[in-house]
Amino acid sequence: IVLNLFMHGTVERGLDVAEGGVDIYNLTVDGLGTATVADSFAAIEQRIVHESRMSWQELAEQLENDWENAEDIRLMMKSIARFGPGGSRADYWALRISEAYSDLVRSTPTPNGFRLLPGLFSHGTVNHFGAKLSATPNGRRSGDPISHNANPDPGFLPGGGGAPTAKSTAVAMVQPRWGNTTPLQLDLDSSLAHTIGGIDSVIALIKAHNELGGTLINLNVISKEQLLEAHEDPEAHPDLVVRVTGYSAYFRSLSKEYRQQVVNRILAESA
C-alpha cells in the first residue's frame, strides 16, 4: 500500500504496482555461485578433457558419493587454476557464464513484457543455497556454501599476495553491464590503516575497481580478534557494525547463522 502511494501511475490507472500500474519498472534477476560454476567447468576441462585423469562416469560417482574416501581426487579437482588470478581457464568460464546468463535474462521478458536487468548477487544466501546443493566438480562438498556474489572463492590466489587487487579485477570483468549490480566483497584487516600507505592503497583500489566497470563495493574493515570476540559474546560489542552483503547491520542483531557466515568469510579471506 505504501509503495503504491509513492509511485507515479498507480492512482491514475487504478492498478497496483504488481499489476502494471507504474510508468517505469526496474526489475532485476540475480545469479548465484559464479566462482563455484566457473571453477567446476575449469576442473572438468583440465582433469577430464585434457589430462584424462578420470572419466565422466568416475566424476559422476564421486559427486554422488560426496567425495567419500577420495580426498586425493577431491583435492586434485580443487587445485586447478581457479577464477580470479587472471588468465586462467576458470576466468574464461566466469566471463562466458556471465555473458550467456546476461543475454538470456535480457532476451526473456516477463509474461507482461517487461525487460529484466541481470546481476550476480547472492544477497547473503550462500549458506541457504549451498545446503541444498550436492557436491560440485570444483571439490566443494555437499552442503557447503556456494561462492559469494561473483567473487572468487577464498584461497583462489596461491600465496594470497595481492588478493584484493586480483579479486577487484575479476569481479569488474564479469559485470553484466545492464545497470544491475555485481558487488565486490572486500574484507580488510583494520591493521591496514596503521601501515604506511595503507589507506592510500585502499583508495587506489576503490578508484581502480570503479574505472574497470565495478558497480558496488561491500567493504568491511575489522580485525579478526575483534570479530571473534564479538562472535563469542555479541552483547559485549553492541556498537560493532559489519557489512553483511548489500546492507550493513549491528553484528549482535544478526542471527547466529548470519554471524557465522560473516565470520567464515572474513577468516577465510585473511588466512
Task: Identify the function of each model-found stretch.
Residues 1-271:
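Acidic, glycine-enriched catalytic cores built around paired aspartates
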